[in-house]
Swiss-Prot record:
It is a multi-pass membrane protein. It comes from the Bacteria. GO terms for biological process: electron transport chain. The lineage of its organism: Bacteria, Pseudomonadati, Pseudomonadota, Gammaproteobacteria, Alteromonadales. The gene is rnfA. The complex is composed of six subunits: RnfA, RnfB, RnfC, RnfD, RnfE and RnfG. Its EC number is 7.-.-.-. This is Ion-translocating oxidoreductase complex subunit A. Part of a membrane-bound complex that couples electron transfer with translocation of ions across the membrane. It is found in: Cell inner membrane. InterPro entries: Ion_transpt_RnfA/RsxA, NqrDE/RnfAE, NqrDE/RnfAE_oxidrdctase. Keywords: Cell inner membrane, Cell membrane, Electron transport, Membrane, Translocase, Transmembrane, Transmembrane helix, Transport. Signal peptide: none annotated.
Length: 192
């Protein structure tokens, strides 16, 4: 049980996919201008990342490895992710049309979010079992959500602040992201 808790904490804080591994930067910068959109994207990405991790593990263990098709791993994981994203988009569209409009193009772009594919591939490379794969995917999603929501809240506050003209927009966003990354470096050594 302790091993699973350490894996979760490590994935959320110590090895955060956005601030440490630099995966998932497109939605991180693109959806973070409004808190409401960031929360919606966080929920959708959490669902997709967790489910894609589990399904990718199952595809790898019960389809690719037994038939010696490991060379199809990346393509099959992309297919799994695309199916999960399509399912998620249909659910979001049926349950919340406003959220679907707010997320816009970023919802289908979860398919190309490198963090989702990165989690699936890292699960295989680190030889996680089923439960570890699920926890790793969920932890990566929680870490992504935490960073996205915090960054979004800071960007909303910065939009209302008196920022010098050369720093407005993307420049101050990059500086803020860098400072967040430095803050998350403080968690290094928390989990070995």
């Amino acid at each position: 049980m302790t091993e699973y808790l350490l894996l979760l904490i490590s994935t959320v804080l110590v090895n955060n996919f956005v601030l440490v591994k630099f995966l998932g930067l497109c939605p991180f910068m693109g959806v973070s201008s409004k808190l409401e959109s960031a929360i919606g994207m966080s929920m959708a990405t959490t669902f997709v990342l967790t489910l894609a991790s589990i399904l990718s593990y199952l595809v790898n263990q019960y389809l690719l490895l037994p038939f010696d098709l490991s060379y199809l791993r990346t393509m099959s994981f992309i297919l799994v992710i695309a199916v999960v994203v399509q399912f998620t988009e249909m659910v979001v569209q049926k349950t919340s049309a406003a959220l679907h409009r707010a997320l816009g193009i970023y919802l289908p772009l979860i398919t190309t979010n490198c963090a989702v594919l990165g989690v699936a591939l890292l699960n295989v490379n680190e030889k996680h079992d089923f439960i570890q794969s699920a926890i790793y995917g969920f932890g990566a999603a929680l870490g992504f959500s935490l960073v996205l929501i915090l960054f979004s809240a800071m960007r909303e506050r910065l939009a209302a602040a008196d920022v010098p003209l050369p720093f407005k927009g993307g420049a101050i966003a990059m500086i803020t992201a860098g400072l967040m990354s430095l803050a998350f470096m403080g968690f290094t050594g928390l989990v070995k």
